[in-house]
Amino acid sequence: MANSSSGVAIHDDCKLKFNELQSKRMHRFITFMMDNKGKEIIVDKIGDRTTSYEDFTSSLPEGDCRFAIYDFDFLTAEDVPKSRIFYILWSPDNAKVRSKMLYASSNERFKKELNGIQLEVQATDAGEISLDALKDRVK
């Protein structure tokens, strides 16, 4: 399906893999990227349930943008286990301007395709998506 503001299509696997993460809890994270022609959003990487948060953050490229979903498990102040699905727009400062613009213009439309996102983060550096930063968001 094409994105009206950027003309970018969203591959069917994106929604399928998101639903596997959300409903079946098959994955810990999914990263999504533009294909080489900048015409379609595709699945980039998938981390299984045993994948660490460090593995997730190291999967994000230092010099390019990505969309990402992370299923964050945590304990409440009352020691109740909970989970929140984070949507992350990764747009590092040193990414190419064209890439930043393409991801920014596709962001809202892509987010709407992934029904069930609970929290959103737009990050330009690793500190903005540190484990502590996510913990602060779920308090």
UniProtKB/Swiss-Prot annotation:
InterPro entries: ADF-H, ADF-H/Gelsolin-like_dom_sf, ADF/Cofilin. Keywords: Actin-binding, Cytoplasm, Cytoskeleton, Plant defense. It is found in: Cytoplasm, Cytoskeleton. It holds the Pfam family Cofilin_ADF. PROSITE patterns: ADF_H. Disulfide bonds: none annotated. Disruption phenotype: Decreased germination rates due to decreased alpha-amylase activity during seed germination. Increased susceptibility to infection by the fungal blast (Magnaporthe grisea), bacterial blight (Xanthomonas oryzae pv. oryzae, Xoo) and the herbivorous insect brown planthopper (Nilaparvata lugens, BPH). Almost no induction of the defense-related genes PR1A, LOX2 and CHS1 after exposure to biotic stresses. Residues 5-139 form the ADF-H domain. It comes from the Eukaryota. One of its GO terms (biological process) is defense response. GO terms for cellular component: actin cytoskeleton; cytoplasm. Actin-depolymerizing protein. Severs actin filaments (F-actin) and binds to actin monomers. Involved in innate immunity. Required for the expression of defense-related genes PR1A, LOX2 and CHS1 upon biotic stresses. Required for basal resistance to the fungal blast (Magnaporthe grisea), bacterial blight (Xanthomonas oryzae pv. oryzae, Xoo) and the herbivorous insect brown planthopper (Nilaparvata lugens, BPH). Involved in the promotion of seed germination. Required for the expression of alpha-amylase genes during seed germination. Belongs to the actin-binding proteins ADF family. Interacts with LECRK1 (via kinase domain). This is Actin-depolymerizing factor 4. It comes from Oryza sativa subsp. japonica.
